Amino acid sequence: MEFSNNAICKITGRHCVGFNQKNDAQITVEVFDDRFVFKNQSIYLAEYDLDDILNIDGRYEYVEKGSLLYQETEPKFERNYFLEIESFKNTVVLQVEDSSELLNFVEIARELFMG
């Protein structure tokens, strides 16, 4: 998802979501009432309509209060991503094995939301 490509955590207001990898590169997702925006260290990457995301069945589900499991079901991208709430407010961190995994996540987002 330039992605949470993330319905990324609770769609009840504005949230910032950080996808961190070992070298601390980060993609930030700002969730608004009707869209969410991906940025990489303040560089604009993409913007998506929340309705489009919420209409993708089976891709996101809440696993417990404040947590979200992203599950890609296409064989090409058969991975699970667990997003866990950190101690700071409205922030979610996705732990990945290496930078290539983060790039894969970005590609998944493009596939899902840009066709």
What is each stretch, according to the model?
Residues V17, S42-Y44, S99:
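Short, solvent-exposed aromatic-acidic interface loops
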Residues Q21-D24, T28, F32-Y70:
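Phosphoinositide-binding peripheral membrane targeting modules
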